[in-house]
A protein has these predicted regions:
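Conserved AMP-binding A3 loop
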Residues: 30-33, 175-184
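Conserved pre-ATP/AMP-binding loop-to-beta segment of ANL
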Residues: 2, 17-18, 134, 139-140, ...
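Conserved G/P- and acidic residue-centered "switch" motifs that form tight phosphate/ATP-binding loops
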Residues: 56, 77, 183
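Structural core segment of the AMP-binding/adenylate-forming
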Residues: 47-48, 78-151
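Hydrophobic alpha-helical segments in the ANL/AMP-binding
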Residues: 9-11, 42, 46, 64-83, ...
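AMP-dependent adenylate-forming
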Residues: 7-30, 134-141
Length: 184
């Protein structure tokens, strides 16, 4: 029997909800917390119109939000497109366009790069990209395409949401679209 990534987390969260799932500089996350956050993010993204098969680009350094967003995509049946946050603007633009990502999840700034400004510049060149989700503290009220990660988690908590991945075929669908630098 083939099991989806979303189902693996959900099963483990049911069996061992208080057991450590992830240890990071930000602290400890349990299986129950990870599953709950992934479900909330999936519900919020689904509320924005993200569906099974849509591409979700992740431009994040190693952090808990990367893991939660990955599992949220799995719960949606979406395709994860992990991208190196160190990519220069032109390469990032190409990969986002080529992947046809409808959502990008990133940090507000990383290693001196202002991703909010970068995406403001990129939006006109990326017709498929509908939303940007940012991990950080800045108030983003000025653009209805940009959402704070924490706000989406809050808005998705407790939503009645039937996960696409629970419908049975998700384990056999494409889950990730991986780009390389071309070197080995």
């Amino acid at each position: 029997m083939t099991v989806s990534l979303a189902a693996v987390l959900a099963q483990r969260a049911t069996r061992d909800p208080e057991r450590a799932f992830l240890l990071s500089q930000q602290g400890r996350m349990t299986f129950g917390e990870a599953d709950s956050q992934a479900e909330a993010l999936a519900a919020a993204l689904h509320g924005l119109g993200v569906e099974a098969g849509d591409r979700i680009a992740l431009l994040l350094p190693p952090c808990p939000e990367f893991v939660v967003a990955t599992f949220a995509a799995a719960k949606l049946g979406a395709v994860v497109v992990p991208l190196n946050p160190r990519l220069p603007g032109p390469e990032l633009r190409y990969l986002l366009r080529h992947s046809e990502a409808v959502v990008a999840v990133t940090v507000e700034t990383f290693e001196g790069v202002d991703y909010l400004q970068l995406f403001e510049d990129l939006f006109p060149h990326l017709p498929e990209l509908q939303y940007l989700v940012t991990v950080g503290e800045e108030d983003l009220w000025y653009d209805d395409r940009i959402f704070q990660y924490e706000d989406l988690l809050s808005s998705g908590q407790g939503r009645d949401y039937a996960a696409a991945a629970a419908e049975g075929d998700a384990a056999d669908e494409v889950f990730g679209l991986l780009y390389t630098s071309g070197t080995t």
